Amino acid sequence: MTTITDIAKAAGVSIATVSRILNYDTTLAVTPETRQRVLKTAEKLAYKPRRRKRVSPQTTVALIQWRSEQEELNDLYYLQIQYAIEARAASAGYHLQSLHLEQLAAETTQNVQGVIALGKYDAGEVATIKALAQPVVFVDQNMLAFDCDSVTSDYAGPIEQIIHHFQSVGINDIGFLGGVETSRSGREQFQDVRTAAFDRVMHAENLMQPAFRFIGAFTPDSGYELMKQAITKLGDTLPHGFIVANDTMAVGALRALNEAKIEVPQRVSVISFNDVAVAKFTTPPLSTVHAATDQMGQTAVELLQARIKDPKRIPRQVNFKSELIMRASSL
């Protein structure tokens, strides 16, 4: 298992600096480059690629990113998938050309023979991506309706599992911190499956309390602000259990609870999503839903390989099961 010492050594900084960066300490005076290096080092050390024979690059594949580099550092989930795509593409003999959506100009994307699109896109953006090259594989969005292969992760099932876990330990007052995602064009707002599943299951269990549901952005700062709102607004009725839509939001939420001297998990249990590297280094370590990001990235490349070999192959969606990992942030 990767330790803070390992990360500090690889990134060339102190152990204390690593700890504060992994906990998104906003009072730490470091350069953006140092913060980026530490976060990326943590994810790279946590990622363990399968050993494969590497071959000389023969095919150029575009990897389309929908988030900026800074946005990726605020939600490390996509960075995990990116590393898996890069490793599998290299072993398959693909030259990977990494681009953001705004960079899709003809002069920068010549000779592309396939596309992997990481993130969420509206119909206009899908058309732009498909015009670049065929075939296209989308990762983290079901695109069967657009005749494209897709790789996704099951988040609805774990929401139900978490709620039932809370009930089993006597917690029926359950809060939720979630986020909203919008296409880069701003034309479409995507419904988050975690939020929808939370609403559905809580209503089915007759546990839904709209006042316990807070929606912001998938960032540490938003998690911090949303939990502060919950603490201020709800006071003594603050829920004993919180589901937080991703780990980096949960880091901010833990900071707000700590500042308010609210003990975790004795007073509030917190369970989040994605199991990125920082989840192991929070205080206390986060209970979280592990997304199969390694397998998602590898499968995206393998689906692309299959479609390049057989363009008439019927598109398919591969939806990976997620696993609840219990740590010290929850009862």
From Swiss-Prot:
The UniProt keywords, alphabetically, are:
Carbohydrate metabolism, DNA-binding, Galactose metabolism, Repressor, Transcription, Transcription regulation
Residues of the HTH lacI-type domain:
1-58
Record's superkingdom?
Answer: Bacteria
Q: Which InterPro entries match?
A: HTH_LacI, LacI/GalR-like_sensor, Lambda_DNA-bd_dom_sf, Peripla_BP_I
Q: Does the keyword Cytoplasm apply?
A: no
The record's DNA-binding region positions are 4-23
Q: Does the keyword Ligase apply?
A: no
The record's GO molecular-function terms, alphabetically, read: DNA-binding transcription factor activity; transcription cis-regulatory region binding
Gene3D superfamilies cross-referenced by the UniProt entry: 3.40.50.2300, lambda repressor-like DNA-binding domains
Query: Which pathway does the database say it acts in?
Result: Carbohydrate metabolism; galactose metabolism [regulation]
Biological function: Repressor of the galactose operon. Binds galactose as an inducer.
Protein's name according to its UniProt entry: HTH-type transcriptional regulator GalR
Origin species: Lacticaseibacillus casei (Lactobacillus casei)
Its taxonomic placement starts with: Bacteria, Bacillati, Bacillota, Bacilli, Lactobacillales
